[in-house]
Amino acid sequence: MKTEYTLTIYTENQVGLINKIAIMFSRRKISLESMNSSPSEIAGIYRFTIVVSETEAVVKNLVKQLEKLVDVFKVYFNTNDEIVWQQMALYKVNTAVIMKEVKVERLLREFGAKAVVIRDDYTVFEATGQDEEINKLLEELSKYGLIEFVKSARIAIIKNSKGIHNKVLKMEANDPTKKPINNEFLNHKSMIFEM
């Protein structure tokens, strides 16, 4: 049975990486419902948050394949119950309608929307929440002449995660290129090059 999964992918910031990741989804005919990319809590490491609707077996296989990419450090997949997630939406509404209709103002307050731009001809409101809340406000504002609407990709934090920081520190500690090289001839250079 298909379930909604959120994949959290920790990567290096490399040109073309988004394309490599997208190709992996495309080859498997997996549709991306949402995709967000941002810096993580560690400098130089980026975090992709991708939402898909697939079976657990397909997602597990995809995770294994993604982790084989050179620039990918770690991939996690979680159900909605295992994460805290939000989206942001912007709604553009005719200012005259807002001033005239008390219901609209009450509705915006009920959904926790706040004005980010107020002009004579329109007002832009911002609301954060989950799909149901954002779509419900969209449905309600459509009754009052909604001019424009846009919704962001999902951002999520894994509830039981300790973050990737400790894993990165362990990887750095085990990196063979970082270990000091002992050169037995370092202090005897005058003797080595004598003829």
Across the structure, where does each feature detected by a protein language model lie?
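Long, contiguous binding/interaction regions
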Residues: 1-46, 51-195
